[in-house]
């Protein structure tokens, strides 16, 4: 990232992308913010619109080092929203910040259906309007915001997975940071049970078992002698290489479908030797591929 934000007199410069998400109540603004949060954006929902420039200023580059950028969610609940929104945009532009404005909407009938399903009140119903009139009035009031939007998302026929794919394709790599898919590698022992959260499970009980070598039994798949034993045959090394090739082929396909988290469980009998060695081999490769990857040896001390 660039140097930290400075005062206006110094010529403030934002070193990170700034996005503003607004739109019709019930159209999916909160869902959009959740997707951006999963993509490692710093998200703030319900921010008073007049505070947007100050928020951008105080969140300097160092504070946002682990994030892709800022996403601010704003809606009509605030009095004089449209007027203050226009003033906030003008202030941001004076600061040299050109935020990307996303407007989220849906067709009237779909919004009516969603409110009937959730049974939540529309913000404008507190002004004495019925739901249908409140939706129409909100659309009218927010017309200037929609007109100023860089992108308008109509979520009428969008599932959450559709929405995630659209946002992911466009904004997941603005800063060239880690890929959006988070991979959790879990080694485990079948004698203790398969991890319930696993999306993919691989059974490695066909590999050479160090347990039957009394000198290796106290060690684990974290130790070099065990790794050399497990992958000491041509067939074991071929499996390891093909397994890793398979995973590096498969993970981008999950990523392209909008998945943001996947748990890969790798098991052997006790969860101490073969599964640990293979999980560590996969970890080494995935870390070089810029995935956000974690590893857990669940039964290492039990096996």
Curated annotation (Swiss-Prot):
- GO MF annotation, one: ATP binding
Q: Does the keyword Magnesium apply?
A: no
Q: Which Pfam families match?
A: PapZ_C, RapZ-like_N
Keywords assigned by UniProt, alphabetized = ATP-binding, GTP-binding, Nucleotide-binding
Q: Which InterPro entries match?
A: P-loop_NTPase (IPR027417), RapZ-like (IPR005337), RapZ-like_N (IPR053930), RapZ_C (IPR053931)
Family the UniProt entry places it in:
Belongs to the RapZ-like family.
Recorded protein name is: Nucleotide-binding protein DVU_1631
The UniProt annotation places GTP binding at 75-78
Its job: Displays ATPase and GTPase activities.
Q: Which residues bind ATP?
A: 23-30
């Amino acid at each position: 990232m660039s140097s930290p934000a400075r005062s206006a007199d110094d010529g403030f410069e934002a070193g990170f992308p700034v996005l503003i998400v607004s739109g019709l109540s019930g159209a999916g603004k909160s869902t959009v913010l959740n997707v951006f949060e999963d993509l490692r954006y710093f998200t703030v929902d319900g921010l008073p619109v007049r505070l947007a420039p100050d928020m951008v200023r105080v969140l300097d580059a160092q504070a946002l080092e682990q994030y892709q950028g800022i996403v601010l969610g704003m809606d009509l609940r605030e009095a004089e929203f449209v007027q203050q929104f226009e003033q906030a945009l003008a202030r941001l532009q004076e600061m040299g910040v050109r935020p990307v404005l996303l407007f989220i909407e849906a067709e009237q009938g779909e919004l009516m259906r969603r409110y009937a399903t959730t049974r939540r009140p529309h913000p404008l119903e507190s002004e004495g309007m019925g739901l249908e009139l409140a939706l129409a009035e909100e659309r009218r009031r927010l017309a200037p915001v929609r007109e100023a939007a860089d992108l308008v998302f109509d979520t009428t026929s969008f599932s959450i997975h559709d929405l995630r794919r659209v946002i992911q394709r466009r904004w997941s790599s603005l800063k060239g940071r880690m890929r959006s898919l988070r991979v959790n590698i879990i080694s485990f022992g079948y004698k203790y049970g398969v991890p319930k959260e696993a999306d993919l499970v691989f059974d490695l009980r066909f590999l050479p078992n160090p347990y039957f070598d009394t000198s290796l039994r106290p060690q684990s798949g974290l130790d070099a002698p065990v790794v050399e034993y497990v992958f000491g045959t041509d067939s074991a090394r071929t499996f390891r290489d093909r397994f890793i090739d398979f995973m590096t082929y498969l993970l981008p396909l999950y990523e392209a479908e909008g998945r943001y988290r996947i748990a890969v469980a790798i098991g052997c009998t006790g969860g101490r030797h073969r599964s640990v060695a293979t999980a560590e081999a996969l970890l080494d490769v995935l870390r070089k591929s810029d995935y956000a990857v974690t590893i857990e040896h669940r039964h290492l001390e039990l096996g």
